[in-house]
């Protein structure tokens, strides 16, 4: 009986073994765990127990499943070979065709490289290869022209081939590998790639072209060796950014402009800017910190460029098609866009554009819609000066009415082949009938900051450096110490008529630095079309009935006040043919004196600057102009009457007022420092304005004058040593309100921006000085507390009037 059962089991085992052998021989002989000797192995199992035969049955079932999977992939286009411990791709032979496979899942196997068979799937869109031992990817991967999803997580890749960057990938997952860098060609995926996961690698830096991935929305760089984030990264439109578990110490300030960012992971980084404690609060707090830091850096860059707290930075000049520099303020309506501010923070001119720093804008007159001189007129300029002195023409249209005048900086570009033209300027001051103008001498300007480089027969114009406010103050000191006069006046020629041609030889300039080139600053006064006709009604003629009234500044410094000019000397030039064409009149802004400059001209206040001032030609105006004609200013609602009765000794009034203002500012800042350090028993840094921006010290000062005048003061916490902008504003508002309640005059109270922006330290000093003056008069504090504040009233009002942006009469 037992022998019969044994024979039956043996026959079943042999049958199974032969079936398995035939299945393997049909195309699966290379699969791991199977072989051609399976039949003999099963035959040997006939001598074992029944449990061995059941294991062989399960292995036979697995073999059938692999064949079934290949068959399903042949019909459906989905190849699922996950978790089969495969080291090689199964050979399908000619029985199954997988070239039209769309999805291939080869994850959780033992592939050492991407199988070559997979790279032949031209229609493959999704390829999953995670949890393998892949060390390399063949170059043939570029044949997968339809691949959009590639998962290479948890492999052993040390680098990615550049061919991957030529695929239309939308999702690229390469986390948990050994990558030390990403391919530089990653920017080629800018149109398609939306998700990039390179976490848990060994990346020390990121490719520069990463910022070109404009379609990228999710970027994970967790657990790498990154020391910083490149600025190119901030150009992306990311929604999620994960840079946690790296070595990043600071974030780029530009990251605050990533408006699309929703999720930002920064934990486990040695961050100092922003602090790690602040990063835990969320994205909004990080962006606020970076915004504040950027504002402070901008202020620091201004101070590093020798700009004081009142300096107004100007736009960089832009170039037109002809290569000339165009001032940004000359575009559009010049009446509305003319700037009235000056760099020192106050304005003492009567609307004319006189600034501490000269931008020296140059502009082709043919490109300007406001220019009234034709090319034929400009061609008549004589070229008689020697080639050692290169000058640029200042052209100015005389203005009769203040409501229609404007000033445009402009220069005359000389032809490269033409020799430099001789510029002789005529000062015309017509009488009531416009028939007897006088004549004055020409004055040459040796400009120390703008030169014209001449080489190989070509002359080029160089843009001078911007003269800062500090340099201007140094120039004033030099001018005060020098005893050389600036101008020399000649007797007028009463027999000169506006249309006479008379040669006036300019005085030779003294070039201290040995330069063979010289450039003159440009300024053109334009007149509105309703005052001067351009089509015949206002053109100049030989027998015109009027001449222009042109005022030439007689001061060697930049700030020129028309009412301080003593007299106006008319003159004309013979070098300009203006009989049948309308020309423009111009003047040159005086510049700061040079250290070694010498002059042949004398005036009462002295100085070392040489100035060339004059008029190219005169334009005929219909109505006669008297010597007291009001010239138009930039502000159309103001008019200025020229005063010719001021004595010459008062010409230095502006300079004296400048010194007085500087002295008063120094006294006010010293007084502010003394008040704070003596009352609050603390030491202030050199930059007082930055120490007052949070308003804490000012609130304590208000409470010192009147206890509990500021009920609550926001102070920085130990973890975060700086207040938010909202709390700083609240402190400053509380201080200003306390000043009003104590009785400080509203006109002497600074505004919140003076404190928060750190630009109005003088206004803050005025407010604090007035506060303690009231404190001393009221007897609220100690007797000696008002000692430093008593002299505040007079200089305070004087300084505020001087600092006012409205022009002084």
Swiss-Prot record:
Ranges of Basic and acidic residues composition bias in the record: 351-368
Disulfide bond annotation, renumbered to this chain: none
Primary location: cytoplasm
Renumbered residue ranges of the record's region Disordered: 27-53, 295-373, 423-442, 490-550, 783-809
Segments annotated as LRR repeats: 72-96, 98-121, 122-144, 145-168, 170-189, 191-213, 214-236, 238-258, 260-282
Keywords: Cytoplasm, Cytoskeleton, Leucine-rich repeat, Repeat
GO CC terms of this entry: cell cortex; cleavage furrow; cytoskeleton
Biased composition (Gly residues): 34-44
GO biological process: cytoskeleton organization; intracellular signal transduction
Subcellular location: Cytoplasm, Cytoskeleton; Cytoplasm, Cell cortex; Cleavage furrow
UniProt xrefs under PANTHER family: CALPONIN-HOMOLOGY (CH) DOMAIN-CONTAINING PROTEIN, PTHR48051
Protein name in the entry: Leucine-rich repeat and calponin homology domain-containing protein
Organism for this UniProt entry: Drosophila melanogaster (Fruit fly)
């Amino acid at each position: 009986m037992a022998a019969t059962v044994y024979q039956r089991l043996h026959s079943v085992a042999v049958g199974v073994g032969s079936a398995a052998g035939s299945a393997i021989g049909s195309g699966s002989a290379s699969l791991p765990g199977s072989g051609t000797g399976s039949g003999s192995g099963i035959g040997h199992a006939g001598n074992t127990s029944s449990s061995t035969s059941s294991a062989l049955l399960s292995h036979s079932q697995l073999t059938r499943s692999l064949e079934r999977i290949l068959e399903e992939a042949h019909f459906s286009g989905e190849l699922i070979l996950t978790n089969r411990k495969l080291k090689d791709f199964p050979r399908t032979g000619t029985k199954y065709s997988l070239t039209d496979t769309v999805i291939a899942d080869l994850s959780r196997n033992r592939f050492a490289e991407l199988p070559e068979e997979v790279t032949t799937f031209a229609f493959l869109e999704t390829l999953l290869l995670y949890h393998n031992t892949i060390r390399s990817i063949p170059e043939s991967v570029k044949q997968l022209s339809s691949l959009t999803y590639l998962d290479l997580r948890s492999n052993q890749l040390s680098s990615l081939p550049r061919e991957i960057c030529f695929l239309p990938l939308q999702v690229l997952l390469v986390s948990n590998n050994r990558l030390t860098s990403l391919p530089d060609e990653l920017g080629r995926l800018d149109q398609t790639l939306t998700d990039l996961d390179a976490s848990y690698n060994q990346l020390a830096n990121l490719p520069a072209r990463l910022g070109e991935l404009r379609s990228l929305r999710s970027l994970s760089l967790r657990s790498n060796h990154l020391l910083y984030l490149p600025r190119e990264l901030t150009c992306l439109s990311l929604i999620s950014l994960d840079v946690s578990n790296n070595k990043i110490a600071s974030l780029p300030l530009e990251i605050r402009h990533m408006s699309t960012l929703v999720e930002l992971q920064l934990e486990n980084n040695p961050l100092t800017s922003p602090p790690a404690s602040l990063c835990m609060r969320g994205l909004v707090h990080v962006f606020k910190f970076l915004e504040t830091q950027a504002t402070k850096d901008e202020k620091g860059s201004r101070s590093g460029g020798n700009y004081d707290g009142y300096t107004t930075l100007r736009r960089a000049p832009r170039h037109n098609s002809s290569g000339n520099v165009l001032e940004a303020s000359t575009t559009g309506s010049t009446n509305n866009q003319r700037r009235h501010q000056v760099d020192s923070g106050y304005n003492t001119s009567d609307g004319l554009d006189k600034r501490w720093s000269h931008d020296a804008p140059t502009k082709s007159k043919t490109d300007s819609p406001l220019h009234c001189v034709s090319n034929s007129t400009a061609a008549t300029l004589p070229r008689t000066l020697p080639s050692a002195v290169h000058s640029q023409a200042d052209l100015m249209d005389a203005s009769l009415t203040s409501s229609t005048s404007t000033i445009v900086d402009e220069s005359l570009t000389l032809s490269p082949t033409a020799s430099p033209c001789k510029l002789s300027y005529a000062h015309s001051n017509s009488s009531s009938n416009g028939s007897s103008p006088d004549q004055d001498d020409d004055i040459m300007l040796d400009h120390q900051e703008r030169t014209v480089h001449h080489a190989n027969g070509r002359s080029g114009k160089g843009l001078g450096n911007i003269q800062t406010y500090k340099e201007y103050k140094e120039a004033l000191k030099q001018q005060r110490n020098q005893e050389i006069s600036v101008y020399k006046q000649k007797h007028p020629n009463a027999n000169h008529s506006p249309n006479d041609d008379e040669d006036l030889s300019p005085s030779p300039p003294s070039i201290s630095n040995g330069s063979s080139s010289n450039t003159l600053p440009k300024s053109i006064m334009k007149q509105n079309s309703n005052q001067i006709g351009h089509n015949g009604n206002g053109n100049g003629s030989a027998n015109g009935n009027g001449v222009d009234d042109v005022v030439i500044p007689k001061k060697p410094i930049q700030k020129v006040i028309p009412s301080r000019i003593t007299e106006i000397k008319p003159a004309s030039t013979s070098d300009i043919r203006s009989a049948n064409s309308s020309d423009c009149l111009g003047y040159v802004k005086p510049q700061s004196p040079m250290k070694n400059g010498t002059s042949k001209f004398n005036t009462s206040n002295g100085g070392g600057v040489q100035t060339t001032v004059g008029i190219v030609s005169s334009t005929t105006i219909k109505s006669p102009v008297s010597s007291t004609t009001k010239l138009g200013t930039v502000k159309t609602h103001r008019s200025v009457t020229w005063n010719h009765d001021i004595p010459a000794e008062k010409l230095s009034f502006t300079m004296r007022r400048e010194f007085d203002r500087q002295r008063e500012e120094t006294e006010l800042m010293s007084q502010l420092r003394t008040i704070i350090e003596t009352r609050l028993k603390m030491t202030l840094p050199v930059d007082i304005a930055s120490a007052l921006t949070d308003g804490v010290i000012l609130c304590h000062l208000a409470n010192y004058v009147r206890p509990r005048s500021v009920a609550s003061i926001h102070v920085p916490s130990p973890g975060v040593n700086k207040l938010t902008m909202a709390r700083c504003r609240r402190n400053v508002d509380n201080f200003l309100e306390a000043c009003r309640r104590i009785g400080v005059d509203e006109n002497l109270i600074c505004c919140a921006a003076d404190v928060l922006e750190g630009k109005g330290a003088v206004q803050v000093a005025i407010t604090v000085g007035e506060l303690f003056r009231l404190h001393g008069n009221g007897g609220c504090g100690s007797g000696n507390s008002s000692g430093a504040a008593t002299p505040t009233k007079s200089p305070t009002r004087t300084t505020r009037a001087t600092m006012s942006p409205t022009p002084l009469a």
